[in-house]
A protein has these predicted regions:
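An acidic, low-aromatic, low-complexity terminal/linker signal
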Residues: 1-104
Length: 104
C-alpha cells in the first residue's frame, strides 16, 4: 500500500494515496460561524465544495504561528465523500507492505 504522509505538529499521519485527489496552494477558505476551532471553513475549488479541517487543531495542538511558506491544502476524495485538510508539512510517500503485522 502506498501512503501519502504529512505532519501536524510532532505527529506524522498517512492516508492511502488512492484517496488523495490533489494538493493545492493556499486558497480562499470561507469561515463558517459557530463551528469547532479545527473546522477552518469551506473551500470552493473547481466547481466543488469541500469542508476544510486544520489537522493541528483537530489533534488538540495550538494554532501555528504565522508561517513564511504558503499553506498547502490536501484534497481527499473517497467514494462520494470529499474533505480538505491543512497539514503543517507534506513529507512525501512511503510504501507499506500489506502483509506486514503491526507489532505495537
Amino acid at each position: 500500500m502506498k501512503l501519502f504522509v504529512f505532519k501536524s505538529k510532532d505527529e506524522f499521519l498517512g492516508i492511502e494515496s488512492d484517496y488523495v485527489h490533489r494538493i493545492i496552494d493556499d486558497s480562499k477558505v470561507a469561515p463558517v460561524p459557530l463551528t469547532p476551532e479545527s473546522y477552518t471553513g469551506l473551500l470552493y475549488h473547481r466547481g466543488e465544495l469541500f469542508d476544510v479541517i486544520n489537522m493541528r487543531l483537530l489533534l488538540g495542538y495550538p494554532a501555528a504561528e504565522g508561517s513564511a511558506e504558503t499553506t498547502r491544502i490536501i484534497i481527499i476524495k473517497w467514494l462520494d465523500k470529499k474533505l480538505a485538510v491543512i497539514p503543517d508539512e507534506i513529507t512525501g510517500m512511503i510504501w507499506i507492505d500489506d502483509n506486514s503485522k503491526n507489532t505495537n
